[in-house]
């Protein structure tokens, strides 16, 4: 039984040489966020009183990227093994709390498995997460006597008989702070690697008569670490497959689960259909009967009931009411809002603008910093000229306005209800209700005109 108080140590000091990258290994993204963030999130969900993050290589970048004031940063200046890393964190351990040891490059460890490990830890003993492998080569072996764990021996230090053992150490364990500090102080580096192994505390605990309980993870992928990009990509696919399966079982129709990426959180209604190669980032909310076409990217957006997003459309920080249609090849940038029944067609970009109920922008337009009323038609090629090189200005368009093709609205400008803007017009002054505005150069016809001929 674990103590009521629990803190977590996350080892994240490694350079990750085999990643061949300037980025610290634990900052490489999995499902849209750094590997180590997955581990931090798990620790927080467990209710850890403190999270101690042991860092070394790329420490400043780690601090800048994670920017979490609740983390306690512990420097491991030299990487001399897992035991040495824990020794750096040991001064922060309270005697009466449990200490759970995790790894920043083992990102898929589940809260459920960790809760079982904490619950299984004997009073005053150690809880150890282990797995059995068909090919345990390279891993530390769990040594038992009469069924009881008595030690862990690393592969390089193991005898031939010990190498036949198929139960291996995952590195994840929990022990109480008082005993753990004492055992850490007794570690030495008299081994093939010349490092301080955290695994040596198992033999020390056994010598003290402490019980050591083992727990297996629900899935092997939970304890798989990342040392190179191949392993990272494999875990990415494992994670995405799991997310896709959960969505399918919850009623979301993924037309090809192997070509769907969830890099955040998806909240959804009923009868959702998502085509291939769709990417979900941040927190996305989909209402009932929403249809998402192939190749779309949705980030931090809300899409109302019965709306359809056609292929290759990008939505970021946008909000759509019910029965909206967007795309194909449209882009809604932060602050874009579509009222019920609004339509945005191909190659239309909307930024920090609201399109009113039933309004349409069908083709090739830019609408930025604008408030557009209900029942408005935005003709092809319309641009709200919102920026003078220094400041942004707003365009306001009332209800039932017809804006002809190739119109430029030079903000700040207001077009009142019912107005009509002729094609090719540049609007520089406010337009009153029900006015027709046209600004064009007089059309000239020259008979018999001959185009210039290139000199040979």
Curated annotation (Swiss-Prot):
Any one GO CC term of the record: membrane
Region (Pyrophosphorylase), start-end ranges: 1-229
Active site: 363 (proton acceptor)
SUPFAM superfamilies: Nucleotide-diphospho-sugar transferases, Trimeric LpxA-like enzymes
Residue span of region Linker: 230-250
Classification via InterPro entries: Bifunctional_GlmU, GlmU-like, GlmU_C_LbH, Hexapep, Hexapep_transf_CS, MobA-like_NTP_Trfase, Nucleotide-diphossugar_trans, Trimer_LpxA-like_sf
Signal peptide coordinates: none
Location of the protein in the cell: Cytoplasm
Keywords per UniProt: Acyltransferase, Cell shape, Cell wall biogenesis/degradation, Cytoplasm, Magnesium, Metal-binding, Multifunctional enzyme, Nucleotidyltransferase, Peptidoglycan synthesis, Repeat, Transferase
Binding-site list for UDP-N-acetyl-alpha-D-glucosamine: 11-14, 25, 76, 81-82, 103-105, 140, 154, 169, 227, 333, 351, 366, 377
Subunit structure: Homotrimer.
NCBIfam families documented for this protein: glmU (TIGR01173), PRK09451.1 (NF006986)
Family: In the N-terminal section; belongs to the N-acetylglucosamine-1-phosphate uridyltransferase family.
Protein name: Bifunctional protein GlmU
Organism of this sequence: Yersinia pestis (strain Pestoides F)
Gene: glmU
């Amino acid at each position: 039984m674990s103590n009521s108080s629990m803190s977590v140590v996350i080892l994240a000091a490694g350079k990750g040489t085999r990643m061949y990258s300037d980025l610290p290994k634990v900052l490489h993204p999995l499902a849209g966020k750094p590997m180590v963030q997955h581990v931090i999130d798990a620790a927080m969900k467990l209710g850890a009183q403190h999270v101690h993050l042991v860092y070394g290589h790329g420490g400043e970048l780690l601090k800048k990227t994670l920017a979490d004031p609740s983390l306690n940063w512990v420097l491991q200046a030299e990487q001399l093994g897992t035991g040495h890393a824990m020794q750096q964190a040991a001064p922060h351990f309270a005697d009466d709390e449990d200490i759970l040891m995790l790894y920043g490059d083992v990102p898929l460890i589940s809260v459920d498995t960790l809760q079982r490990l904490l619950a299984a830890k004997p009073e005053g003993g150690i809880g150890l997460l282990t797995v059995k492998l068909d090919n345990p080569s390279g891993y530390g072996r769990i040594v038992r006597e009469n069924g009881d764990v008595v030690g862990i021996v690393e592969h390089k230090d193991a005898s031939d008989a010990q190498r036949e053992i198929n139960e291996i150490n995952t590195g994840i364990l929990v022990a109480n702070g008082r005993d753990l500090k004492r055992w850490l102080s007794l570690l030495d580096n008299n081994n093939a690697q010349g490092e301080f192994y955290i695994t040596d505390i198992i033999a020390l605990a056994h010598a003290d008569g402490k019980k050591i309980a083992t727990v297996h993870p629900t899935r092997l992928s939970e304890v798989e670490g990342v040392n190179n990009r191949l392993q990272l990509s494999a875990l990415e696919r494992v994670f995405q497959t799991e997310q896709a399966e959960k969505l399918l079982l919850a009623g979301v129709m993924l037309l090809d689960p192997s070509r769907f990426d969830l890099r955040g959180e998806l909240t959804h209604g009923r009868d959702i259909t998502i085509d291939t190669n769709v990417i979900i980032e941040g927190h996305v909310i989909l209402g009932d009967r929403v249809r998402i076409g192939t190749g779309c990217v949705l980030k931090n957006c809300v899409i109302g009931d019965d709306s359809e997003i056609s292929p290759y459309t990008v939505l970021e920080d946008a909000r759509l009411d019910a029965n909206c249609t967007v795309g194909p090849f449209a882009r809604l940038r932060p602050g874009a809002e579509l009222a019920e029944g609004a339509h945005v067609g191909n190659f239309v970009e909307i930024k920090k603008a609201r399109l009113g109920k039933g309004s349409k922008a069908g083709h090739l337009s830019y609408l930025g910093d604008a408030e557009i009323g209900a029942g408005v038609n935005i003709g092809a090629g319309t641009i709200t000229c919102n920026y003078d090189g220094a400041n942004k200005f707003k365009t306001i368009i009332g209800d039932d306005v017809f804006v002809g093709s190739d119109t430029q609205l030079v903000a700040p400008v207001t077009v009142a209800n019912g107005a009509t803007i002729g094609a090719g017009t540049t609007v520089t002054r406010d337009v009153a209700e029900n006015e027709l505005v046209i600004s064009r150069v007089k059309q000239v016809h020259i008979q018999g005109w001959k185009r210039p001929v290139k000199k040979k």
